Amino acid sequence: TAAKDLVGVVGAGGASELVEFANGELVMVGGRVDRDAPITDAPLRELRMRQAEWGWVVAALVRDGRTIVAHGDTIVRPGDHALVMTTNDRVNEATKMIGLKRRNIERAIIMGGTRLAELTADEMSDAGLSVVVIDEDQSRCRYLASRHPDALVVCGDPTDPDVAGDLDLGPKDVVMGLTGWDEVNMLGCLVAKAKGAGMAIARFNRISYVSLLAGLGIDAAVSSRLMAASAILRFVRQGQVERVATFSDTDAEAIEIEVASESEACDRSLLDLKLPLGVVVGGISRNGTTFVPDGSTVVRAGDHIIFFALPRDIKESAALFTA
């Protein structure tokens, strides 16, 4: 769910997104590549040869608005938005490789009394964070206070600097703009960052705002439209498709699909499949074990394959794994 994904983003420090596959055992994490990141300025193939254990794969880069599906000769550059697939026990390692700094977040300030805000408050509390909820509507505040007795409910304007100032914000705080209005979410996040909050996440509906977020200092975003699109695509893809994830600044998709025993891919290596250039297989879940594959990995019936693909290559790729 979106609320669980928000907990993942907070836990992964400077990540712009974190999407779980295979019941949470495989994770796609995204973030802006730092200029000092170990992954920069060498082909990925060369980096892999240098590292004894390679438990993650760069699926794609978004550079200057263009999606680059990563391969061995791809060179990652500072400022790229990298999407990396890894196992859930190696998320910290993957984020360090792209230069994300882990943050010790202790308190979540949630702007808005929406259903998403409520679910997020529950998830953040379950994750051990102190929770503050800000909403302007007095009756809604009374409801929130009764529904979330462990949270501090503040009745006020989330964009008001005085309201933010009273909270004594600091680097261990994450602020989340989860109202139903894009502008309120963005402005509330900016005010909170100016008052010292360590991390800001904004909910938005207008996709055109995405390109502005990083420049404004907003660390991550959750899109209502993209969440709806993922649900719709999951329905449209059907078949053995388990999950579809869409992303804010690329039209590529990450798809989890179960391999059919009668499929063309079954009992063949990934290298032998000759997947389209716009496709990367980022992870496999097999009988309770998850791993990041390489070209020699042989696909088996019942495997859950997570692949990242450009729109033009999705149908052809999915057909390889289905009957």
Question: Model segments located where?
Answer:
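Cytosolic regulatory regions of ion transport systems
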Residues: 1-323
